[in-house]
Structure formats: C-alpha cells, structure tokens
C-alpha cells in the first residue's frame, strides 16, 4: 500500500504494482484446524488500521476508507453484543499507525496523516471519558510499524521513517511519558506484524520492498533479539495475534491478497498452515478475545479495497 520511503501510491498504480514480487502460493490450508465464523461488520469500510481491546470492546481508529481517504473516525465493537458503535474521532486522521491497549487506554502511535512523511506524534484514548490526549512523540517518526505492550511498557518497532525502512525499536514508559531507544530489530522491515507471548515480542513478516518470511523475537529483559524459524509464506501487510501460547499470522499482500493463516508454536519453533481466512485481506486488525481472534477490516484487493469484514477465528484446542 505504501512504497518504502513514505511515497503513497495512487490506487491505480498500487493495484498494478502491488507491493512485492511474491504471488500467493496455491497450496491448500487445513480446513479442519480451527473454525471461522462471521461477526457484525464494521459500520464503514476501512483498511491499514490496527485495533486494540479494552474491557471487552475492540477499538478501531483511523485508516483508509473505501475511497482511499485517510479518516479520523473511531469505531468500537462490543464483543458480547456483537455490535459496533462510533466513538470520539481522533484529533487528526491516520493511516498505517500503531495501535495498542495499555492500562485501560488505547494508544495510537505515528502513521501517515496524508501522503507526506510519517508522523512521530502519539495520542491516547480514554474509553470512559471518550477523550484523546497527546503524549510525548516518538523519537523517530514512523508508519507501517508495529506497537505492542509488554511488561507495562509500549514498544514501537520497525516501519518506514523519513529515511526509508528501519529496524528502530523504541520503548515508552507511561509513568514518565518518555521514550527510550533499545536494541534495533535485526531485519529492518515495514508492513510487519507482531504479538506478545510470555516475555517475548514476536515480530513476523513485512517487506522492504520484497515480502519477508522472517520471524524474530525481542526479549525486553535482556534487550536482545532471537532469530526463529521462518514463516512458511513470505508476506507483507499481514496481521498477527496470539492465542493459547501460539502465534497466528493472517493474510497479507503481494500482486494478490493472501487468505493464509499460519500458526507458530514457540515450544517447537515450528509453523503449520491452519484454516484460511474466508475473506482474503491485507492491512487489517487482529485482536484476541479469550481464545478467539477477531480479524477486522482490511483491503480485499491489492492496494485500495477497504472492507467492513469482521471474521472470528477460534483455534483448535
């Protein structure tokens, strides 16, 4: 969707070139490994927007709409009621931001506000007050990065900065409202995905510009990285989430759009392909609620193709 270096492609050029030279493989998924079911769709189509869970509700801010415009709107999904509502819009529109929940708040880091360079600004959203508050900016402006919470701190990893694709890794301390730079990711990439399992942050896939199968894990306690088994299918523009101590990598983009759902088991350092997404997508959000994973929005074609799709995956137990 975004060419390395921050250049936003037009819809027609993006569709023609997509974002890599890898085509989705034709090998088959394992349909009996996990179950998918449809849930209530988003109120409006969007893509390039991660999501985050706070107290039984999934918050989906910003992204591109169906016309390819950057939006500031916030949609909120009540998991128990299977119903979407709108919340207070962000102070400014964002696409390709990092989104993470921490301490009952939703943090939005970086992203693009338009076709210009990446932003470093950070906001948090208070669900109880329905208010957005600016926080200290990231040291390095970035978009198409990942943002996760581990050990009470927020990590912003990889993405596109003003000089191109980076492996930058910065940590935010909410108590002091300060960022620090820690050990960089060994493989710089953007349009990557990440999830936390135990004391490690697993970072998977991405591109720079070709698609990566790379899986690397960051250990905050030792400020070090581990290189792990490659994902079977190299993908950028994917989403990831953890459930039952395993990592799941969904979708992605090449000249086509991936349906793939691949599972990584840290105990064996091994991958397997499980039940594919019913709707192939890229640039979506993935959020774990209980044992299930909700995969929300995203583009159904390479480039622009925002959708309202909300599908729930329940892994095997």
Residue ranges and their predicted role:
Residues 1-8:
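Bacterial N-terminal signal peptides that target proteins for export
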Residues 15-18:
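C-terminal motif of bacterial Sec signal peptides marking the signal peptidase cleavage site
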Residues 20-317:
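Kelch-like beta-propeller repeat domains
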